[in-house]
Structure formats: structure tokens, C-alpha cells
């Protein structure tokens, strides 16, 4: 499953630059709703946090991981974190008032799954996998002003291929997300997504050959490609000054649930040694300027 579809900073920007309609403070409510503040031109967001995740895809053991954040926009070109990687939207937003916007650009991510920090002693006997380097593209469209003047519904698809020879596979991840501000300081976003993988990816992370079976005692298993997972994520952020338009410090939190399906669920690394239900929890602090 794609951990976060779309830029957290983009959701923060779209959710908070129009916050006067939701503000409870009378003075703020009277402010110009088109005042984009720090988001009117080039802007950057950096942050650091931490979280917990499964020790491998399908594991029921959890490990700590760092959660750095880097997002921004230069000349209308948005860029930022996409899971353990980066993306760029090469379609500049020339008309900020438009209700329909298109997204298209490159992405890459690093996938260190089963490369280390494997907590399960039996799965560890299967050996380590190489770190995958995946490159591809993201395509999408977003629609603003659906339920209120400042919300946003985004539909997108990521497609990526391993170019490092780790799994030599392909992933396709469609998603839909809805974001809205709750005030000038608070925003939230809900996303639903799924991931389809090819046979090379499934074979690398979920198959067990005769050598692996002899080493671990797990039964042999031949995994096929297909829909690997589906899930949902809930993201929230709070600007500590009370108005995100002025930039500065903020805090964020993220909860992701993913359900493995198909051969990813049936594989012994999941069905016998792990759990098809996967959780990711993260939080941290950010600074926008």
C-alpha cells in the first residue's frame, strides 16, 4: 500500500490558506479569504518526527522509524516526500482559483523491505533482500469546492518500477483522498488506496523456494502478482500560531491501516509468521517558511 498518496504539505496548504471560512475568531473570519500568506509564492516545509511500522511487509512485529518531512513549491512546481522517496508535480498551478487541477510528474522511492531489522527469527532465516530503488510517475486530478469553498477531492495513480534489480517488479497504486480545513490552524485528510503488483514483486517478498523452506522450516510457496493490499489513512495537522498562512511551527499526526490480500496474505511470512493487518503510526513537528 502506498503510505501517503499526495503531499502532506499540499494538503496543509490547500486546507489552511482558505481557513477564514472556518475560523471561529471574528477577526480572522473577516480576513481576505484569498490571502494565501506564505503560500502565495515559493514556500518550503521541513520537519522531523518518528513512528512505528511492521518490521517487514506482513509482519506482526513493529519497529521504530524516523519520519523526516520535506515539501515545497518553486515557481508553481510542487515537490515533496512520497513514502520513502520524492515526487514532483511538473504542471505549474498558473490559476490558483481554478476548481480543477491536474497533477503529473516523476517519482522515486527507496524500498528497504526485508533488508534488515527483521524481528521474526524464522523469517530472518529466509535471508535479506536487496534494497529496491523504484522510479515512475504520478498522475492525477483534483476537484475543489465540493462541500465547502475550501475542501479538495483528489484522484491519482502512482506507477513505479524497480531499477536496482532487487525485485525487478512493478507497482500500480490508485487512490482517492479528501482534505478540508477545520479552522485556520487545523486541517485533516482521509485517503483510500490500493496497490497492485506484478509477479516479480510478489515472488521476491512473498514466495518461499526450496532453499528458504529448508532454512526456515516454512512451507514452500509460489506467490503470484495481483492486488497486494488496500487501506486507509487519516492525516491531521495543527499550526501552533493559530494561522497556517503565516508559516512557522506546526505539528502533524498520521495513522495508516493496510490490509494485505491475495498471495501477500496467503504467504507463510504473513499467514504463519505475521498478520495481514498492517498499521503505521507517525507524528512530528514541522516548520514552514
Predicted regions and their residues:
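Residues on the lipid-exposed face of transmembrane beta-strands in outer-membrane beta-barrel proteins
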Residues: 48-52, 68-74, 86-92, 106, ...
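Short loop/turn motifs that connect adjacent beta-strands in outer-membrane beta-barrel proteins
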Residues: 24-25, 30-43, 58, 77-102, ...
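Cleavable N-terminal export/targeting peptides
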Residues: 1-40
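Outer-membrane beta-barrel transmembrane domain signature
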Residues: 141-145, 162-250, 257-265, 287-289
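Transmembrane beta-strand segments that form the barrel wall of outer-membrane beta-barrel proteins
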Residues: 46-54, 78-88, 120-124, 152-163
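Residues that define the transmembrane beta-barrel architecture of outer-membrane proteins
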Residues: 42, 62-68, 100, 129-135, ...
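Transmembrane beta-strands of outer-membrane beta-barrel proteins
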Residues: 42-48, 68, 79, 102-106, ...
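Outer-membrane beta-barrel translocator domains and adjoining extracellular loop/strand segments
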Residues: 34, 58-62, 116-123, 167-172, ...
Amino acid at each position: 500500500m502506498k503510505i501517503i498518496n499526495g503531499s502532506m504539505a499540499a494538503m496543509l496548504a490547500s486546507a489552511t490558506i482558505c481557513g477564514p471560512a472556518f475560523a471561529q475568531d471574528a477577526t480572522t473570519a473577516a480576513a481576505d479569504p484569498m490571502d494565501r500568506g506564505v503560500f502565495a509564492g515559493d514556500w518550503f516545509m521541513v520537519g522531523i518526527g518518528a513512528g512505528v511500522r511492521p518490521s517487514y511487509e506482513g509482519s506482526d512485529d513493529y519497529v521504530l522509524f524516523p519520519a523526516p518531512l520535506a515539501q515545497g513549491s518553486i515557481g508553481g512546481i510542487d515537490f515533496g516526500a512520497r513514502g520513502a522517496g520524492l515526487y514532483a508535480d511538473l504542471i505549474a498551478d498558473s490559476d490558483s482559483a481554478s476548481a480543477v487541477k491536474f497533477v503529473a510528474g516523476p517519482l522515486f522511492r527507496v524500498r528497504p523491505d526485508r533488508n534488515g531489522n527483521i524481528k521474526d527469527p524464522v523469517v530472518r532465516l529466509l535471508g535479506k533482500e536487496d534494497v529496491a530503488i523504484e522510479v515512475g510517475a504520478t498522475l492525477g486530478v483534483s476537484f475543489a469546492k465540493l462541500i465547502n469553498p475550501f475542501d479538495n477531492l483528489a484522484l491519482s495513480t502512482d506507477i513505479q518500477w524497480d531499477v536496482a534489480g532487487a525485485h525487478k517488479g512493478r507497482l500500480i497504486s490508485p487512490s482517492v483522498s479528501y482534505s478540508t480545513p477545520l479552522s485556520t490552524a487545523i486541517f485533516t485528510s482521509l485517503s483510500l488506496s490500493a496497490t497492485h503488483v506484478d509477479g516479480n514483486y510478489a515472488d521476491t517478498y512473498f514466495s518461499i523456494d526450496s532453499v528458504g523452506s529448508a532454512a526456515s522450516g516454512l512451507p514452500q510457496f509460489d506467490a503470484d502478482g495481483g492486488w497486494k493490499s488496500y487501506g486507509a489513512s487519516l492525516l491531521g495537522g495543527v499550526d501552533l500560531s493559530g494561522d497556517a498562512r503565516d508559516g512557522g511551527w506546526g505539528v502533524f499526526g498520521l495513522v495508516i491501516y493496510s490490509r494485505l490480500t491475495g498471495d501477500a496474505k496467503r504467504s507463510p511470512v504473513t499467514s504463519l509468521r505475521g498478520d495481514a493487518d498492517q498499521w503505521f503510526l507517525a507524528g512530528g513537528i514541522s516548520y514552514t517558511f
